[in-house]
Curated annotation (Swiss-Prot):
Species whose genome carries this gene: Dictyostelium discoideum (Social amoeba)
InterPro entries associated with the record: Urocanase, Urocanase-like, Urocanase_C, Urocanase_central_sf, Urocanase_N, Urocanase_Rossmann-like, Urocanase_sf
GO biological process, one term: L-histidine catabolic process to glutamate and formate
MF terms in GO: urocanate hydratase activity
Keyword NAD listed: yes
EC number: 4.2.1.49
Pfam families in UniProt: Urocanase, Urocanase_C, Urocanase_N
Keyword tags: Histidine metabolism, Lyase, NAD
Homology family: Belongs to the urocanase family.
Keyword Lyase on entry: yes
Catalytic activity: 4-imidazolone-5-propanoate = trans-urocanate + H2O
Annotated protein name in UniProt: Probable urocanate hydratase
Length: 672
């Protein structure tokens, strides 16, 4: 395999020019994008694409790239899609890299583009409809070349998928620094993104797509499991969801976690998905047990709630059709409801109108974008009306941070809470009601990848994590709300292996706090050093975390001091991670709620067993979590204030400004 992967070090293949492989008919493809470029902007898009190639090839490639631009709305450079090796995460020793740190990044990039992992692998999109690793295949080849030849005295800078080059640094510096979608704030609209992406100058990195840290749908299963468990506790007053019905939408890279999480919680889950390919993939991976395209047949399974057995069902069709049918079916009780359509990208494949077929929608969004937008907004109004009707009958609904409430309000749906000047919705975001408190305790989606590719190494890390949680929860003075987190996470890691969550690299996610993350990293590093693990481990996290993301409609929606629209936390986080030991860092515009609606960042840290990497892990993880807790404490969150005070007691060098609390009576007594 080393010989096969040796081509990664050669860069863009143009001597000789490879034959065009065509589109792979065995994988789904991104829908075409509407072209909103002027003639001069089109010319610039072609010129920008050709600069990756010698002048002798320009006359050959220019027409080809123009055809791609006109047909797909973007230049992917399909001719250069690699076909002589399988795109997947290979064991780290098989990568032709001088730096093992760089080799670990190559592994993570290829995992993000694995056909079993990525949503649209030919278009370099990992999840979310437009969450891109690169803008085109030339960038992929050039990046892999740089990573192959770099040393630990260099840093690769990535500008929205484009490898700007290798720059001298030192061993303590990050090997790669990634930015995606960074634009001047006044130019951060959907239209700006569409124009700049078509021109090849920016991309939407989503979260872990553009930071090379995606681990398949498992990456959100644990968080979804926690959300559902706590929704049951908060809304239904139950500790178990056995016999409860949960309805939502989406079986994509992130949303696909819903069926698995609901099954783990014991619920009956019905998820609608319009893409036949997405349904087929999740069914083949056993993340969905049953598939229906006829709602009458599906509802004939209504007795399953009485059987008290967990069940995951996919409805292949539009979620609004499902919701409206549920309104008609008075005998079916829906206990919990949400939505995970990709409404950060509402008019280009993230949300499909109920009035026409999946195929017709893909045509309309390119050829008749104005009509398509009108149909989407009408569908959003119907969607909201149906949810309101079921909520009136007792269903508890929440926004899953996908901009559903925001886009429904823009469509003039009945979604605004009266008396709030249009600033609040009648339904909560799940961060406001559930995950915000968990983040404020310092718990978030920590994850790791075993670079050996050996499932036995993953089993060992699961055992290490389980034993560590047992140790942490048995210590004296653990607050009750923290104890509950430990208990939920212990159950998760105890059962993770049997739930067969791995898709792609040998990876695991585990919600953990600052102490837990640091101790896990140290334990993994020592296990590599003493040979318990056969190869290094890469640790990371979702950007959707305690400190990683500023997003007023999701991660910071429970910030109460008016700073939910400020991005200082996410920016400070990535800067702080970079000089405290991260192997690579990333900062993005967008994330799950849309371009211009969030700033989010992440990191990767390579653990090879050395003392230096242990020190880096301790230093960086302490900052990576406590930064967000400090910010949340300053914005009047009691959980965060108590958590940061405990952190300061444990570490005398940590000194955080604590707010003085003002009496509401005093404020209200002022003569405004």
């Amino acid at each position: 395999m080393k010989d096969l992967l040796s081509s990664l070090s050669k860069g863009i293949p143009f001597e000789p020019l490879p034959e065009h492989p065509g589109l792979d008919s065995t994988v789904p493809h991104a829908p075409g994008r509407p072209i909103n470029l002027t003639l001069n902007e089109k010319k610039l898009a072609i010129k920008n694409s050709l600069r990756y190639f010698p002048n002798s090839l320009h006359s050959i490639l220019a027409n080809e790239f123009l055809e791609e631009l006109n047909k797909y709305g973007h230049i992917y450079m399909y001719r250069f899609r690699p076909t002589h090796y399988e795109m997947k995460a290979y064991p780290i020793e098989e990568y032709p890299a001088k730096s093992r740190q760089a080799a670990s990044i190559m592994l993570m990039i290829m995992n993000n583009l694995d056909r079993e992992v990525a949503q649209f692998p030919n278009e370099l999109v990992t999840y979310g409809g437009n969450g891109s690793v690169f803008q085109n295949w030339a960038q992929y080849h050039l990046t892999m070349k740089y990573l192959s030849e770099m040393t630990d005295q260099q840093t690769l800078t990535m500008y929205s998928g484009h490898p700007m080059g290798l720059f001298p640094s030192n061993e303590s510096s990050p090997r790669v620094i990634v930015t995606n979608g960074m634009v001047i704030p006044n130019y951060s609209s959907h239209k700006d993104y569409e124009r700049m992406y078509a021109q090849g100058v920016t991309q939407y990195g989503q979260m872990t797509a553009g930071s090379y840290c995606y681990i398949g749908p498992q990456g959100i299963v644990h968080g979804t499991t926690i959300t559902l468990l706590n929704a049951g506790r908060k809304y239904l007053g139950v500790e178990s969801l056995i016999g409860k019905v949960f309805v939502s939408s989406g079986l994509g890279g992130m949303s696909g976690a819903q069926t698995k999480a609901a099954y783990i919680c014991g619920a009956i889950c019905i998820v609608a998905e319009v893409s036949p390919a997405a349904v087929k993939k999740r069914h083949a991976q056993n993340w969905v047990m049953e598939v229906y395209s006829d709602l009458n047949e599906l509802f004939a399974r209504g007795s399953c709630s009485k059987e008290k057995k967990p069940l995951s069902i996919a409805y292949q069709g539009n979620v609004v059709t499902l919701w409206e049918k549920l309104v008609e079916e008075k005998d079916i009780t829906v206990d919990l409801g949400s939505d995970q359509t990709s409404l950060h990208n509402p008019f280009n494949g993230g949300y499909y109108p109920v009035q026409c077929s999946f195929e017709e929608s893909n045509r309309l969004m390119v050829q008749e974008p104005t009509k398509f937008k009108e149909m989407v907004q009408e569908t959003l109004r119907r969607h909201t009306t149906a949810i309101n009707a079921l909520s009136a009958r007792g269903m508890k609904f929440w926004d899953y941070g996908n901009s559903f409430l925001l886009e429904a309000s823009r469509a003039k749906a009945d979604i605004i809470k009266p008396g709030t000047d249009g600033k609040e919705f009648i339904y909560p975001s799940y961060v406001q009601d559930i995950m915000g408190d968990i983040f404020s305790l310092g718990f978030g989606p920590f994850r790791w990848v075993c670079t050996s590719g050996n499932p036995k190494d993953l089993e060992i890390t699961d055992r290490i994590a389980k034993e560590l949680i047992e140790k942490l929860r048995s210590q004296p003075g653990v607050p009750k709300n923290v104890q509950q987190q430990f208990n939920d996470n212990h159950l998760w890691i105890s059962q993770a292996g049997e739930h067969k969550l791995v898709v792609g690299s040998q990876a695991r996610i585990l919600y953990s706090d600052c102490i837990g993350r640091s101790e896990l990293a140290v334990a993994f590093n020592k296990a590599v050093a003493d040979g318990t693990l056969s190869a290094p481990v890469v640790i990371s996290r979702d950007h959707h975390d305690v400190s990683g993301t500023d997003a007023p409609w999701r991660e910071t929606s429970n910030i109460k001091d008016g700073s939910q629209f400020c991005a200082d936390m996410a920016i400070h986080n990535v800067i702080g991670d970079s000089f405290r030991g991260a192997t690579w860092v990333a900062i993005h515009n967008g994330g799950g709620t849309g371009f211009g609606e969030a700033i989010n960042g992440g990191f990767g840290l390579y653990l090879c067993g050395s003392k230096l990497q242990e020190e880096k892990a301790r230093m960086m993880l302490n900052w990576d979590v406590n930064n967000g807790i400090a910010r949340r404490s300053w914005s009047y969150n009691d959980n965060a204030e108590n958590t940061i005070k405990r952190a300061m007691e444990l570490d005398p060098s940590l000194k955080v400004t604590i707010p003085n609390h003002t009496s509401d009576d005093l404020i209200n007594s002022l003569n405004f």
